[in-house]
Amino acid sequence: LASSAASDVYKRQGTQRKGDVTSSVASVKADNFVKGAVKDVGQLIQGKVAGLAITNPNGDPTGSTQIRLRGTNTIGGANTAPLVLIDGIPGELGTVAPEDVESVDVLKDGSAAAIYGTRGTNGVILITTKQAKGVDINQVEYNGYVSTSLIAKKLDMLNADEFRTLYPDQDHGADTDWIDEISRTPISHVHNLSLMGGNSKTNYIANLNYASRQGIMKKSDFESFQGRIEVTHRMFDDKLKLKFGLFGKKNQMESTTSGGSFRGWVYGQATRRNPTDPVRNEDGTWNENVSKFEYENPLALLYEAEGNVKKTQLRYNGNIVYNPIKDLTLSAVFSYIRDNMNRGYGETLSHISALRDGLAGWSSVGAYTKMEKLMELTAQYNKEIGAHKFSVLGGYSYNETDFEELWIDNYGFQDDYFGGWHNIGIGSALKDGKANIGSKKTPTNLIGFFGRATYSFKNRYLLMGALRYEGASQLWGTDNAWGLFPSVSVGWRITEEAFMKNQKIFDDLKLRVGYGVTGSQPKDPFLGVAMLKYGSYAFVNGNWIQTIVPASNPNPDLKWEEKKETNIGLDFVSWGGRLSGSIDYYNRDVDGLIYEYGVPTPPNLYNKTMANGGTMRNRGVEVLVTVVPVQNKDFEWSTTGTFSLNSNKLISLSGSIFKSDYDYFNTGTVEYSGQVADSHRVQVGESIGNFYGFKVVDVDSEGRWIYEDRNGELVNYKDFTHAPEDKHVIGNGLPKWYAGWNNTLRYKNFDLNVTMRGAFGFQIINGGRMNYENVKNSRFENRLKSVNDLVFGKHTLSPEVEPEFNSYYVEDGDYWKIDNITLGYSFCLLYTSPSPRDTERSR
């Protein structure tokens, strides 16, 4: 992790020396990235940045990581993702090859992110790709890898013999491991080729990246090819620098569901399937039970469906930097991004949807186009007068996005040869008005004026102030389309004081204090104006006419969610760099949470109104420490630990105008036996993420639940009414703290890297046990082997007990995992001509 005071933190709005930064910023360089098979940039820094939670929610090779910085900051009305900038251009983690990344900087607190306005309210991730710099011999770099994966721990389901013993009347004669039938040993490979070079005036870099990834489940394949070229030219004695970049990417994935990649329902069917069911009948057809609801052959779901999704992205970007006079830098950034997606999916006449539901050949097609334009103009003036050093920056930003989408589905095809998604119009359902066709267009824009000033005295006392004035089209029609977002931070380099000159412990010690305000715009447009939509049909003058009804009420007072954050931090370097790190404490108050309030009709046209009302608080501590315990000529050991603690509380659900009828709302779903029920409660005075369900404390002599009701009294199964008022908070799904531990050991030419991380202080809902340990669950034929375990160590669960979500299925979710172990060997390659890179590494 970078801690050098001389390194730069690159921002779209200018640059700052690391030593002058007064905000909470984490930097991870390429040498410290997570090595091995990674899907996107998020996995490169997993466990490397305190306070940054990075998760991979599933094994789908097309899926991306999910990132949350410093807890939860909204209850659903605003955007939650951090702003991602790739070489200063807004983008997504999946649009840059991990092998092409040089460094990642994370701006964590409000004083650092305020200048980025509304899109920086959840933090900013700055991705810097590999660059060609200075006079350099033409170089070619290749790196690649081949990887495989496996299911670390399968659900321990009954096999065929065990199933026959327990349920002899349901023996269908076969012996099928359904998980094995739908899974495989996948092989993935990634190849990255870079060419770079230049002279004192012109530099270039070209990069090609190809990735072929297989998922563990059959028919979950992903293929990606991308390339970029970037040319930088300097002229007029280096006063003018021109940079032009071109990026293109094409993704293709196999699809087993409409609009997506792998259908998770297939795995669910494999786990519930009777292990004595054959895959196929004696006549070669798929073994299906069309009379049983939601009981489907998972192999048929895979092989009686066909589809693919193709995505392309083309990006042009340019940058002009001009220094007309000493200390003055003028910059202009332009980019144009065009995303296209085309998808198609179809099911055959042998698919369960045709056999059971009468949807012969159900198929769908869809496409979208997204165009994003960015222009940003900045002017920065830097001046140093004696012990005083200051800089002033001002700028203007314009961002415009146009999104267009269309989709069609149809069924009622006569055969599998002339219909389907390749010829979707000939199905009968669309002609009969039973299928769907639609389109939409969503234009948005974001305009910002911003400024920043920094001051340093004797490199000892540091001050930064920033201001952004921003308008968003999502708030069009309200009185608050524009917002003002200020920030200020100060720093004190204590080691520059005279009283620290004779101490031998700290090489650098800096105290930071910052405060910043950022805003979150609504996820959806036009929430502040009255909207209409189509409703039901009415019979008027002998004709059925579709009515138009209210869809929302106007609210001219709707505005941004405002996050006000205070950060106090300490950076330190000791004993010649053998010990370094940072400690941060932050407090975030989010005011004006966007929430849907119930309102009377009349006078309102609609019974709900989107408005600002609630308040939420996040507090936390983040610690990063790097130690080099051993360092000599032949052996070096460097170890880095990260720790972050976060507490969250909903302070209020009501505002000065709109009041919530209750101090809570229920949300979330948990599926048991095909039913969906609210599983979470968000309540004033409590943390976000609480599980809400019935609390069981014991079982009776027959294996039936004994509950604790609303009054704390014990109630047996037959007398318990399952009233919502008898539910309790039975856990919380958000970790209270995270930790990471990264080790690098070098012995002569060998090096060993070990990356570990964990999350603690949270619970999970074990849906597998909830569904597969209940004998009465009629929609699931197979069971876990633990179905015969003693509940609370007393009795097996009674067959009288209906499947339900309760506290028995809430478990401790703490984990500690080894992400990566990499062993490397460095060796010298001799070239016939001099090369600045004569050391290569084998892994």
Show the residue positions of the predicted features.
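Short, small/polar-rich motifs associated with maturation and membrane association
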Residues: 1-249, 257, 315-316, 434, ...
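Surface-exposed loop/interface segments of Gram-negative outer-membrane beta-barrel transport/assembly proteins
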Residues: 19, 134-175, 216-217, 226-313, ...
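Extended, hydrophobic alpha-helical segments in both membrane/secreted and soluble proteins
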Residues: 227, 449-453, 461-469, 483-492, ...
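Glycine-rich, aromatic-lined ligand/substrate-binding cores of catalytic
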Residues: 733-764
